[in-house]
Amino acid sequence: MALTGGFAFWLAIMKGIRMTGTDEEQGRMYGIFEALNGFASLLLSFIMIGIMAIAGKGDLVTGFKSALACMGGLSLVSGLLVLFLMPKNAQYGSKPEEDTESNKITVKDYLHAFKIPGVWIMAILVWCYVTVSAVASYLTPYSTDVLGMSAVVAASIGTIRTYGCRLAGGPLGGFLADKTFKSVAKEQLLGQLACLVTIGIFLVLPGGTSGGLLVVLLLLVGIAMFLCKGTYFSIQPEMGIPTHISATAVAIATLIGYLPDMFVHTMFGNWIDQYGAAGYNKILLYGVGTAVLGIIAAVLAVVQSKKIAKRKAAEQAA
């Protein structure tokens, strides 16, 4: 599943989204995808639960196998639709010179991708989102164990943060990037600043804080997270990453950016086991530090974006 899903499907769809819109539309393209992806995940989860209940008839293993078979069938149908309905030489919003036969990716292109500063900036932005997302997952038990929120309310808000904020944050980030800032790098800077502020506030909240205030803050953390997640791959044109190596760039950024998933949850769990309630403060401080790193990466992205824009302007004037 990791090979077929993460390796093959994910990279192809990321490049496909980039090809769907022009450079000026990248924020909205990825933001809308993020929202639709969240909606589809939520919808399919409920559908699969229904299939498990109907097909299993009390047998959990049979129900689970039936749900897996349905998911596999949907994946197969989706792949066939793309194969037969998508034009072979589709270019959509990408520039024709970037997708010609002469520009097929080579080993040299793979190596070149590692040398592009924007690829590493994108990887750091992904790293920061993944880490902040892990920190946010501990806000639910923190709100109940330390701040005194009802467990039912905290769990409900956690679900809304995961799905509802995804539906709102992705398109909002894309709109801000394309229409307000005219720059994904600047929108990423806003998102990282929002993560810093919202997580930082939890560090100073006293026990017994108003439930209404906690609900608002938990949702704001979710919005801040998805302002970052919805657009971090759409930063590629600003970073001077050519369309024909887009999938390679995403692969590098994903490989590096998702490394925190390998250790942060274990580390956070150890802190809570060792320090109790004080362990949550360590987690929040780690989140604040990560957000600072994200701000630095976003500032570098803004600088790099301006440098790339000046270079393109000079080339056009020549």
PLM-predicted stretches and their roles:
Residues 1-36:
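Cytoplasmic helix-loop-helix junction between adjacent transmembrane helices
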Residues 27-52, 254-265:
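Glycine-rich segments within core transmembrane alpha-helices of 12-TM secondary carriers
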Residues 45, 116-173, 229, 264-265:
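Extracytoplasmic gate region of multi-pass secondary transporters
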Residues 72-95, 297-302:
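C-terminal membrane-cytosol helix-exit motif in multi-pass small-molecule transporters
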Residues 84-108, 310-316:
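Flexible cytoplasmic inter-helical loops of multi-pass small-molecule transporters
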Residues 169-183, 272-273:
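Helix-to-loop junctions at the C-terminal end of transmembrane segments
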Residues 183-232:
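C-terminal transmembrane helical hairpin of 12-TM major facilitator-type secondary transporters
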Residues 238-276:
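A late C-terminal transmembrane helix in Major Facilitator Superfamily
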